[in-house]
Amino acid sequence: MKQNDPVAAYFDKLPETHKRQFEERASGANFNFQKRLTLACELGGTSSGRLLDCAAGTGEITCALLKSGRFNHATVVDVSPAMLQSARSLLTSQIKNVELEFIESDVFTFKPTDSRFDIILCLGLIAHTGRLDILLPHLKSILTPGGRIILQTTLTDHLGTRTVRALTARSEIARRGYRISWFSQRDISDACDRAGLRILETRRHNVGIPFGDRFSPWANFQLEARLEKWASRHGADAIYLLGAG
């Protein structure tokens, strides 16, 4: 672990909590983590070859993509040793016909030892790192010609996101030890333009009721399920498929 890295220290406490988000439970968080997995698989459906997950967490999304049988290599990166170990346990038990490489690293300093990647997953990362103008050119530099990046963010264009940001900014710094980064659709679009990347497709999800799970996980789950179509157009979260411009 990078010494004194507050992001690594924060996520080292969360592997079990993170894994539970992908289980079949009636909460808004579970609904949206599973939706993120589904949409990532959908956007990555035409990719094959070499995969990089640059913030793998506990590995569920990586695992789902690798089970397609289209990939022969996966490099799994995470700054948190505990998260990376959880991902290693899952992937080595579930994936048998793919060359797997596990690297504890900050994605900003990660450099592949040999080949570039056909698809790069960047999910649940940029809120904790910011620095899009450094990250996106770096990811583009390790992408094959015709390769794709899947990038996820929560958007400040959404009223619920702005409400959460306004009410939690100070407490989040105290709780995590670092400041959360927030992005609008324009922020993402402009950063892609500067990096020479194009937004090829976008998927939206997450009704985004502020603190919905705190009041009633079951009711929040019902809202997410019933308003899924609305969220596909106006949701708080966006997942982008990027390619070189």
Give the label of every model feature segment:
Residues L121:
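A conserved beta-strand element that flanks and buttresses the S-adenosyl-L-methionine
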Residues R170-D187:
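Acceptor-substrate binding/catalytic loop of class I
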Residues T58-T109:
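Class I SAM-dependent methyltransferase SAM/SAH-binding core
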